[in-house]
């Protein structure tokens, strides 16, 4: 094991002379640094033609009475701009392997319309297609991540899509793009060759998909200086054999990344309520969510064994909580509320993701608007930002920052699952001379007194900003008419001492500190 892995993954807290004493938890941040950068893409988003994610969420059309920017909802557009979204995946999800891109180009009133059989049988009029997605990404400075159709599409269809988007040559596809109003090609880096090939993307074996991937990848060309980063449809959860087969059978042969999907679901038959849950269910969900650390380790171990040079990246391009839909909504639309519990889940996941960015290069939460663990919820002309949105915003200081390893000595809360829940968690980074420290208190009732110590005695001399996200109850959420029930506010329960930074974390809270 190399030195970096020893720092990142050590199970023993080497806290020197600092003990718990008057503190409930003690943290030591190794401020000398790791030399590892946290990719901004860890904070990626996912948008699918599912429920009201696209229509009514991102897109209302230019003729809508909802305020819009070229057809994009202005309130959602502005919220995403403030969030500094680095990358967004589209058009799915399961929808991707039913999506035929030529249905979504040309005059909107002449586009094909279909029934979205994957998600509730909703009419799909294709008014949001390639141009609308890529133009949105361009306007918001988001890197697009296209998911191609392997399940029901042909090699030719996928190859022509890449040419349509990225070629500046004199060709039928490039001329078709120009005829549809886009003269210059777009830059498209990330391209997924299929989605969930083991399930809704074709119910394939890993051996069969590996061969199919290599065939499709062969014909996805690099045009006009654009270089595709090709991504294989990877495993779900604990299917380590899928990763092993793809790494052996594809390896570096046209594969730059391999995906992984992991949802925080305990029982797929009854996923539980988003807002009405017991204390026991709260801790069980947190436990299930942080099991992702062991899942990441095991997939990465396989990749390290078969790709010791680290040429293939791991991309967690679907993750987040998944509950029963809100009562009275279409079961196929996956609309759920979003509480302070989800904010804690998001923070704990980021704390884990940061440890594994030697191999983990992207994560895309499901989904950006109105679906699953959404950033934003809309209802006709109204919009609310969820607690999860606020965690993404509070944590975006870690994008492209140097990861600082930290040891945490904390009590844990036992639950019905195999992984106990740490009462305190931490992640830290440094960028532009600033040290950014994010702290989590998972305990529902107890404020946690925490000492944050540093290897260097003069690592921190001043706290420049401090905010906290919390509420009176983990079940609290933002809703239409009470949009700011859970929102960040200034935080003052800290002080600098000779021993370090002493912080008192409120129950069920996320705290962000920036210091120098």
Ranges and model annotations:
Residues 1-24:
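Bacterial Sec-dependent N-terminal signal peptides
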Residues 21-244, 248-257, 289-293, 297-325, ...:
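Non-catalytic accessory regions flanking glycosidase/transglycosidase catalytic cores in CAZymes
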Residues 260:
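Histidine-centered catalytic micro-motifs
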Residues 263-283, 329:
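Active-site His/acidic residue clusters
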């Amino acid at each position: 094991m190399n030195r970096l892995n020893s720092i990142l993954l050590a199970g023993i807290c080497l806290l020197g002379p600092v003990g718990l004493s008057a503190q409930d938890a003690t943290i030591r941040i190794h401020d000398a640094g790791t030399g590892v950068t946290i990719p901004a893409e860890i904070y990626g988003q996912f948008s699918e033609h599912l429920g009201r994610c696209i229509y009514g969420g991102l897109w209302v059309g230019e003729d809508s009475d909802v305020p819009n920017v070229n057809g994009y909802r202005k309130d959602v557009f502005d919220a995403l701009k403030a969030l500094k979204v680095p990358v967004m995946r589209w058009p799915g999800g399961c929808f991707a392997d039913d999506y035929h891109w030529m249905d979504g180009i040309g005059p909107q009133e002449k586009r094909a319309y279909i029934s979205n059989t994957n998600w509730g049988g909703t009419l799909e009029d294709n008014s949001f297609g390639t141009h609308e997605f890529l133009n949105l990404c361009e306007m918001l400075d988001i890197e697009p991540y296209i998911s191609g159709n392997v399940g029901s599409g042909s090699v030719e269809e996928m190859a022509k899509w890449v040419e349509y988007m990225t070629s500046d040559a004199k060709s039928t596809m490039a001329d078709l793009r120009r005829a549809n109003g886009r003269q210059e090609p777009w830059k498209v880096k990330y391209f997924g060759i299929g989605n969930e090939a083991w399930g809704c993307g074709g119910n394939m074996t890993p051996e069969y998909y590996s061969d199919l991937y290599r065939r499709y990848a062969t014909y996805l060309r690099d045009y006009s200086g654009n270089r595709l980063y090709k991504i294989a449809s990877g495993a779900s959860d604990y299917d380590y054999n899928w990763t092993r087969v793809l790494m052996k059978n594809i390896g570096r042969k046209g594969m730059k990344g391999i995906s992984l999907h992991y949802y925080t679901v305990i029982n797929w038959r009854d996923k539980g309520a988003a807002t009405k849950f017991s204390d026991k269910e709260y801790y069980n969900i947190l436990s299930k969510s942080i099991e992702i650390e062991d899942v990441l380790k095991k997939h990465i171990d396989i990749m390290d064994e078969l790709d010791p040079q680290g040429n293939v990246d791991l991309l967690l391009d679907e993750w987040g909580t998944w509950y029963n839909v809100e009562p009275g909504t279409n079961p196929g639309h996956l609309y759920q509320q979003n509480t302070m519990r989800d904010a804690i889940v998001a923070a704990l996941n980021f704390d884990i993701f940061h440890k594994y960015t030697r191999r983990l290069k992207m994560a895309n939460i499901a989904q950006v608007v109105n679906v699953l663990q959404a950033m934003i919820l809309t209802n006709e002309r109204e919009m609310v930002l969820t607690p999860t949105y606020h965690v993404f915003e509070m944590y975006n200081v870690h994008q492209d920052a140097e990861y600082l390893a930290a040891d945490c000595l904390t009590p844990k809360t036992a639950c019905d699952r195999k992984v106990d829940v740490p009462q305190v968690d931490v992640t830290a980074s440094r960028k532009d001379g600033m040290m950014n420290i994010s702290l989590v208190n998972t305990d529902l009732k107890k404020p946690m007194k925490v000492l944050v110590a540093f290897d260097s005695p003069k690592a921190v001399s001043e706290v420049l900003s401090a905010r906290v996200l919390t509420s009176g109850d983990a079940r609290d959420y933002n809703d239409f008419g009470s949009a700011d029930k859970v929102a960040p506010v200034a935080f003052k329960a800290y002080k600098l001492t000779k021993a370090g930074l002493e912080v008192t974390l409120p129950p069920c809270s996320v705290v962000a500190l920036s210091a120098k």
